[in-house]
Amino acid sequence: MDAQPKILIACNRHVRETYLAEADLEQLATFAEWDWFECEGGGIYDTNDDPETTKALGERLGNYDGLVVCHGCPTLHAGILDQAPRLKFIGELEGDRFASRIDVDAAWQHGICTVDTTNGSSYPVSEWALALIMISLRNAGAHFRRIIGGDLTPSSQDDFGYINGDLTGKR
């Protein structure tokens, strides 16, 4: 491996312009040489199935030590990985836990580590969900007793607090 690893980022233009902040790319440049392979097609859960894009990516991978993939990237199967003898790791920015963009078995057979960052927001999201559950429990006992008592009338849509979501002063 050269003094600095070479990293290829394979994604569509939208990801390049909105997900990858210039400050992050500048930080990456402090310890690695990086380049961008633009590939349009596919989406969050499906990959780019254009054979020309797949061929071009395979031809380009031979000079890289790492690959970061996201929306637009073709599926990284054994045929592509055969063309990447230097490749040591593949990172997935977002998606479905490698289900579509990375053939994990093929990567492991080639000695390539795979890293998935799609769960990077799991803790903040779970904290937010817990907070919403706690908020929804406000007056839960009273509402439950009302329902058990046969009062199935929803809140009046004329109620200012109902329409505007105002919880001030409620207990």
Where do the model's predicted regions map?
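A short helix->loop->beta-strand "cap" motif at the edges of active sites that frequently abuts
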Residues: 84-89, 109-112
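Short, conserved loop/helix-junction motifs that constitute active-site signature segments
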Residues: 28, 80-86
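Phosphate-binding beta-alpha-beta segment of Rossmann-like dinucleotide-binding domains, i.e.
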Residues: 110-171
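ADP-ribose/adenylate-binding Rossmann-like module
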Residues: 86-101
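Short gly/ser/thr-rich secondary-structure transition/capping motifs
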Residues: 46-52, 70-72, 149-159
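Phosphate-coordination loops involved in phosphoryl transfer and adenosine-cofactor binding
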Residues: 4, 87, 168-171
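N-terminal glycine-/charge-rich "phosphate-binding" loop or analogous flexible N-terminal tail
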Residues: 1-65, 70
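Rossmann-fold NAD(P)-binding glycine/threonine-rich loop
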Residues: 99-112
